[in-house]
Every structure is written in structure tokens, then in C-alpha cells.
Amino acid sequence: MHIRTRAALAALAAIAVAGGSAAAAAAQAAPHAPRQLTFVSRLTAIQFFTASGPVTGFPTTPLVPGDRIIGQDRILQNGKPAGHDNEICTVSFGRDVLCQDIVILTGQGDLQVSWTIQWPATGTRGPATFNGIIDGGTGRFATAHGTFHAATLPDGDMQITADLNAGQQ
């Protein structure tokens, strides 16, 4: 082998090793989504829209197919503000309500979640607990999929416990 060829191969090998080391370091430095995520969701705004127009406050009559609910919540982690969410729900048949939500965790990324609930025949609020799915996300949550459980706390806030990437290896 000529000296020039050996030098070129040595340079390529050095670049490959350096590149591999840099890629490994970047992979270790990249933040990963936690396996479990817990936060509190505190209602900050809600609006009901029916066929007759917007409703002030909570509805006093049953919701019907096509009615919409738009809400926003403040997200708290360990009692401190951590972001917010924007949700929209549509009433379907049989009082089934289909909801889509984007949870925005400041400096961490977003989660797209969805759920269905059964709106009560009487009363003004949805169920005290429900479950949903995590469809994906951005930032630390770019590969997130999983499920979550929501439970109403005594003060009216919702405790959300999410299991991310369950079943993935």
C-alpha cells in the first residue's frame, strides 16, 4: 500500500471513530421521555357550544350530538406551573364525548392525547375518572405512546398519571 493510501485510510478511520463517539455522546445527552409522568391539570377556561350558540357557564340541559366543549388547563408538576393544554371535545350519539388535547409542557415538548367519556344524563360535569391514550408528541416526547388515567381531586383539579411507551422494548 502506498503511503498516501495508508494516510487516507487512517484519516477515514479516525473520522469514523470520532463520528461514532460524537453520535454516542449525542444519544446519551438527548433527553428521553420518562416512563411515567404525573401532573395536575387545573381548569382555567371552558366554553360550551350548542346548536343555539355559546352557553355561559356549565350547561343546564343535556348535551346533544354535535355540541362542542373547548377548554384550557394550567399544568402543574410538584405544585409549580409546568405548561398548559388546549382541548376540544365533541358530543356524539348516546352522550359519548370524543376529546382531543395537546398538552404543552414548557421546555419539554408536547403530548397529543385523546379520550372518550360518557357525559352524565343529569348534572353539569363529566365523570370523576376516565382513561385515555397518548398518540404522540414532540421534544422529549417525540416517540411517546401509551395510556393515561385522570382522577378528580377533592379541590376539583385532575390528577393525571401517564404510562409512556408501555410495551415497547
Spans of features found by a protein language model:
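Long, low-complexity, intrinsically disordered polar/charged segments
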Residues: M1-H2, V113
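C-terminal region of N-terminal signal peptides and the immediate post-cleavage residues
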Residues: I3-A8, G19-R35
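Sec-dependent N-terminal signal peptides
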Residues: A8-A14
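Hydrophobic alpha-helical segments
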Residues: A16, A24, G156-D157
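Beta-strand-enriched cores of mature, soluble protein domains
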Residues: A30-Q169
